[in-house]
A protein has these predicted regions:
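Acidic/His-rich structured neighborhood in mature extracellular/periplasmic domains
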Residues: 1-102, 128, 146, 155-158
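Generic detector of bulky aromatic hydrophobic side chains
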Residues: 44-45, 114, 142
Length: 175
């Protein structure tokens, strides 16, 4: 969806899709091997803010923070085809993790998210769901979507194996 978003002048050119997708998925829009892809959401958010296509609205509204401590990919290379046989890629991922570690990100605790959402969360906003899994920052992502006044999540459901709008409010889903 972001790759098809209009430019500031309201235009969307068909040929821009691949270029926009590359800007969104790769560090500063440059493909330079597997580690240049934005695997961690903390890295993706930093890149998006730096390159002007994301805004972190949670920072302005939530006092709750957590520090990033990433290591999952470099400590589980066997789970990634492009890392399992490439010590060089593992070393690069470890450097990337180290560069992100210690950064502070704002979040909303699940017990502080009302079923009807928050006034500053709008339809189409990107929602990242944090995790307690050691070495990871985010467990799941989706798009904010209000249904009958309740904040829902448009997301790729692993259970339903397709993109769905959550049947219950996001606040309820997280509890």
């Amino acid at each position: 969806a972001m790759a098809l978003s209009p430019t500031e002048d309201g235009q969307v050119a068909e040929g821009d899709f691949a270029t926009n997708l590359q800007k969104i998925r790769y560090r500063d829009g440059k493909i330079n091997g597997y580690p240049s892809r934005l695997h961690y959401i903390a890295d993706w958010v930093n890149n998006g803010i730096r390159n002007g296509f994301l805004e972190d609205v949670t920072t302005a509204y939530s006092p709750y923070t957590q520090r990033v401590s990433l290591s999952y990919m470099s400590s589980h290379p066997e789970l990634y085809k492009q890392l399992s046989k490439s010590p060089e890629n593992v070393a690069k991922m470890k450097e990337i993790e180290k560069s992100l570690n210690g950064q502070e990100f704002h979040y909303i605790p699940k017990d502080k998210l009302p079923f009807n959402g928050l006034p500053w969360i709008k339809n189409g906003d990107i929602i990242a769901i944090t995790t307690n899994t050691p070495g990871l920052d985010v467990a799941h992502m989706g798009i904010a979507f209000y249904v009958n006044g309740k904040l829902s999540l448009l997301h790729a459901s692993s259970k339903e194996k397709k993109v769905v709008v959550s049947k219950v409010a996001l606040g309820q889903m997280l509890r």
